[in-house]
């Protein structure tokens, strides 16, 4: 497997020309910014010594506030206080309303169905809100480093799709930041721990943040980070713990389900405070809306146990993808504030058979890894031997005749990557080809996800199979896909960059992988049937053209035998007997062998007519 050097050409710098770079952990609940100073990566604090910046923005007509100031307004002005905006990135309004029906915001749909949040400052999309958080982090870094940033590395969940990654890059540009690279959060954590410990072997990175869960299985060897497999859930995190506990408190307190937004916010704040307290205490007293009661750690554990189990199921799938057993994992790194919950650490330790590493603050480890990566990419460590390989989560391919999916880049292929595959025309005189880009693990188009469509026109009018079209898939370091189709003889080409308007849900991602395993045998049979039907159609199409042109070369008996064979093939091709179709194709080939030879002889005679032997 090829290993990719992180350092980019032309970015090396002399020591006295050190460039300023930062790593940003743009989190669902909290965000951080870190940098490398005097050879050490560290997170940067605000004037009050706080390293975490709540990912909350409060909008007013005259301006906005970010972080702690914004969070204090959450209970007072819920409609104008936007939190957990990361969950909204890259999703349609319909998807958001279905998944998060209790959000206290008023939405409008843009022309293409994307969400616009109604605030006192006007209609704002999630990209703009994220940009305001990034601006606050960049301002902290600029002040701490006494200079403008030359570039940043921003972390994203490993399961973020194209739309979510592109939205993150757009937010950074809106904030005036130069993005060196988007980096998967678990991979950033591996960088932080790998450089510090220098250990070699298989490592699992269990990342349970506020809004997302990711599991990565990596192999470390002599400074090389190879991502063997990734998995996770793009809509599962500590926020879900909070909401479950808030609902439990609401039921105990007898508060109506559809109470006003202010009460809902008070419930959520009480749940968050109780969750934090229960990490150290066996029970906690809760006061909310005039009600007082006790919540025990045991009750909390019972509420969240199903969610923790879901994360472990994803861990099991990732291990299977990586081809390793749990007992082969040397170390387990936990990332994200939600891993402070005792039940999480306990269950993770039981699953992997060893206690997880916690020597680096789980809230800071991702930002620290991003800072190390940014320091390399900006050119401050040109001689670094650190290597990094990421993977794509689902296979990418094309629709072919018969509704089949031809995989071009398999799932878990390391990125960046470019793969090409040649295709040809199906019909005589075909001058255009529709390119349908697919994502998924199944064999048929109907069972996979459509990413994009575009057309290649200007193909030379040649017999079926005469034109050769090369389709190239390219996935960049940020996981964004571009597809190019080129007719090789003329050089005519068409391309598209895949930026879907919204992404897959967590259940869709999990089910696509699960279904590919559950229906593997069924899919193979369906593919074999579809392939034989396509071949039958091709044979009949070719035969009809040949008969129309040269039927005079056949005797009446020969023509009847060919017609009978073709009719039988046409009939069995309507059924689902693969062997019968295959035998019928062979019979047509047998009945037309002499006819094909005569046509070839006739073509040669026509080509030689009027030419001497010497000319030949």
UniProtKB/Swiss-Prot annotation:
Keywords for this protein: ATP-binding, Chaperone, Nucleotide-binding
HAMAP family attached to this UniProt entry: HscA
Entry superkingdom: Bacteria
Organism annotation: Escherichia coli O6:H1 (strain CFT073 / ATCC 700928 / UPEC)
Disulfide bonds: none
Any Gene Ontology biological process: iron-sulfur cluster assembly
UniProt key word Repeat: no
Family: Belongs to the heat shock protein 70 family.
Stored InterPro entries: ATPase_NBD, Heat_shock_70_CS, HscA_NBD, HSP70_C_sf, HSP70_peptide-bd_sf, Hsp_70_fam, ISC_FeS_clus_asmbl_HscA
Protein name according to UniProt: Chaperone protein HscA
Cited function: Chaperone involved in the maturation of iron-sulfur cluster-containing proteins. Has a low intrinsic ATPase activity which is markedly stimulated by HscB. Involved in the maturation of IscU.
A Pfam family the protein falls into: HSP70
A GO molecular-function descriptor: unfolded protein binding
């Amino acid at each position: 497997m090829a290993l990719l050097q992180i350092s980019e050409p032309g970015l090396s710098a002399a020591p006295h020309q050190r460039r300023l770079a930062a790593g940003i952990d743009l989190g669902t609940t909290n965000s951080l910014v870190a940098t490398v100073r005097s050879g050490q990566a560290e997170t940067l604090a605000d004037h009050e010594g706080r390293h975490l910046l709540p990912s909350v923005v409060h909008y007013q007509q005259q301006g906005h506030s970010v972080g702690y100031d914004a969070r204090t307004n959450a209970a007072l002005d819920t409609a104008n206080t936007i939190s957990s905006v990361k969950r909204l990135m890259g999703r349609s309004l319909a998807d958001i309303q279905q998944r998060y029906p209790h959000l206290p915001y008023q939405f409008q749909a843009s022309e293409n169905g994307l969400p616009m949040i109604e605030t006192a400052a006007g209609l704002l999309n999630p990209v703009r809100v994220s940009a305001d958080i990034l601006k606050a982090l960049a301002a902290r870094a600029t002040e701490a480093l006494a200079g403008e940033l030359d570039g940043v590395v921003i972390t994203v969940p490993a399961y973020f799709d194209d739309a979510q990654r592109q939205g993150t890059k757009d937010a950074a540009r809106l904030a005036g930041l130069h993005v060196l690279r988007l980096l998967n959060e678990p991979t950033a954590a591996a960088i932080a721990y790998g450089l510090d410990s220098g250990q070699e072997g298989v490592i699992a990175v269990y990342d349970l943040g506020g809004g997302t869960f990711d599991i990565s299985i990596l192999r470390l060897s002599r400074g090389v980070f190879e991502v063997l497999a990734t998995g996770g859930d793009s809509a599962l995190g500590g926020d879900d713990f909070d909401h479950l506990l808030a609902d439990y408190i609401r039921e105990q307190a007898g508060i109506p389900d559809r109470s006003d937004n202010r009460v809902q916010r008070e419930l959520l704040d009480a749940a968050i405070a109780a969750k934090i307290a229960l990490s150290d205490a066996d029970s906690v007293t809760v006061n909310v809306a005039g009600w007082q009661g006790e919540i025990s750690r045991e009750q909390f554990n019972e509420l969240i146990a199903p969610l923790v189990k879901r994360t472990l199921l994803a861990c099991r799938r990732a291990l299977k993808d990586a081809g390793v057993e749990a007992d082969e994992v040397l170390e387990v790194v936990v990332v994200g504030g939600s891993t402070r919950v005792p039940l999480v650490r306990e269950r993770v330790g039981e699953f992997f058979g060893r206690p997880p590493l916690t020597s680096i603050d789980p809230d800071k480890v991702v930002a620290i890894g991003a800072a190390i990566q940014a320091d390399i990419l900006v050119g401050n460590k040109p001689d670094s031997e650190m290597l990094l390989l990421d993977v794509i989560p689902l296979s990418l391919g094309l629709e072919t005749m018969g509704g089949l999916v031809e995989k071009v880049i398999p799932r878990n292929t390391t990125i960046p990557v470019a793969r090409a595959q040649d295709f040809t025309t199906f019909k005589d005189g075909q001058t255009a080809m529709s390119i349908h880009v697919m994502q998924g693990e199944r064999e048929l188009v109907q069972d996979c996800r459509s990413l994009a469509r575009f057309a290649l026109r200007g193909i030379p009018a040649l017999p079926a199979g005469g034109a050769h079209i090369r389709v190239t898939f390219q996935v960049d370091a940020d996981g964004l896909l571009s597809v190019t189709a080129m007719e090789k003889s003329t050089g005519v080409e068409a391309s598209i960059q895949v930026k879907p308007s919204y992404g897959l849900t967590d259940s869709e991602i999990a089910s696509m992988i699960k279904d590919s395993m559950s229906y593997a045998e069924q899919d193979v049979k369906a593919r074999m049937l579809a392939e034989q039907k396509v071949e039958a159609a091709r044979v009949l199409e070719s035969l009809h053209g040949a008969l129309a042109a040269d039927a005079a070369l056949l005797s009446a008996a020969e023509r009847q035998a060919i017609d009978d064979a073709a009719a039988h093939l046409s009939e069995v091709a309507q059924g689902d007997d693969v062997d019968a179709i295959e035998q019928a194709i062979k019979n047509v080939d047998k009945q037309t062998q002499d006819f094909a030879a005569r046509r070839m002889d006739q073509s040669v005679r026509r080509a030689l007519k009027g030419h001497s032997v010497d000319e030949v």
